[in-house]
C-alpha cells in the first residue's frame, strides 16, 4: 500500500547525516543528493538521521534544510522530514488559519489517522503551540462547522472489526430520516459520524445504500454545490469509508489546467506515501486515465518534481 522505496541495505544514520552535511557544503546545494537520501528513508530512519545530525553538527536538520532550500521543493522536503505526528500538527495549525470550502486538512487528519496516532498528533500540537487543537478549532470556527469539527478532532474511535448489525440498521434509518428532513447538523446525525468505528459506520452506510437505494453521499451532493458545510460533511464520510477516493480528488483538483495547487499536492504526497499511496495511485489512474506520476511530471518541474516522483516509488532507492 505504501509507495516508499527503501534500499535493501540502508546506510547507517551517521553516514546519511554526513552525506546530507556535504550536500549543504561548498558552492551551492546538492539537491539530488538530498532527494536520494531523504526520499528513500522511512519515518523511523529519518528520525534517526535528524538525531544524529543534531548531535554531530550541533544544528537541527530542519533548520539546515530551511537555509539551503526554497519554494515548493523546500516545503516538500521539510514536510516529509518531519515525524508524522509533528507534520500533522503543523498541517492542522495551518489549516485553522485558513478555513475555506476546500480546506479538508483537519478532516483528513481526524478521519484517516488511527486513534492512537491521532493522540500523538494532539500531543505534538500542544507541545508546539501551547494549546490544544480543540481550542483552535473552537476559536476559528462557528455554527455547523464547529459542531462537526470539534467532535471529530476530539473522538477516540474503536478500531476493531466488530459490527452490530441491528445498530447498523437502526442508525441507517436515523441517517435517512435526517437526510430526508435536511437536518444535516442534527445531534444524532453528527454523533453517528463522529463516534462510530469505521467498521460499524461502513455497515451502517452499506445498509443505507441497500435499503434506501442511494449512497448517502449521493443524497448529500444534491445539496452541496455552494454549501461549505455540506462539502465538509461529504469529505468526512469519504475519508472514513474510502480515503483513497478523497485523496484522489484532492490530487485531481490540485493538478488541473487552471494551475497547480502545490499545497494540496505536497500535502497528499508527503502524508500518504508511507500509508496508502499505491491505492491512491490506482484510484487516480482509474479516474483520470493517466498515471499519477505522469500527471505530476506534466504539472511540476525541477527538484520539486523529482522529490514528489521519488516518493511515489519511482527511481532507484
From Swiss-Prot:
Its main location: cytoplasm. Ca(2+) 3 binds at residues 300, 305. Ca(2+) 2 binds at residues 255, 259, 299. The modification Phosphoserine is found at residues 95, 289. Annexin repeats lie at residues 11-82, 83-154, 166-238, 242-313. PROSITE patterns: ANNEXIN_1, ANNEXIN_2. Ca(2+) 1 binds at residues 24, 26, 28, 68. The modification Phosphotyrosine is found at residues 129, 284. Expressed mainly in roots and flowers. Low in stems and bearly detectable in leaves. It holds the Pfam family Annexin. InterPro entries: Annexin, Annexin_repeat, Annexin_repeat_CS, Annexin_sf, AnnexinD_plant. The modification N-acetylalanine is found at residue 2. It is found in: Cytoplasm, Cytosol; Membrane. GO terms for biological process: phloem sucrose unloading; polysaccharide transport; primary root development; response to cold; response to heat; response to salt stress; response to water deprivation. One of its GO terms (molecular function) is calcium-dependent phospholipid binding. Keywords: Acetylation, Annexin, Calcium, Calcium/phospholipid-binding, Cytoplasm, Membrane, Metal-binding, Phosphoprotein, Repeat. It comes from the Eukaryota. GO terms for cellular component: cytosol; membrane; plastid; thylakoid. SMART domains: ANX (SM00335). The modification Phosphothreonine is found at residues 100, 112. Induction: Up-regulated by heat shock stress. Down-regulated by cold, dehydration, and salt stresses. Belongs to the annexin (TC 1.A.31.1) family. May mediate regulated, targeted secretion of Golgi-derived vesicles during seedling development. PANTHER family: ANNEXIN, ANNEXIN D2. A pair of annexin repeats may form one binding site for calcium and phospholipid. This is Annexin D2. It comes from Arabidopsis thaliana (Mouse-ear cress). The gene is ANN2.
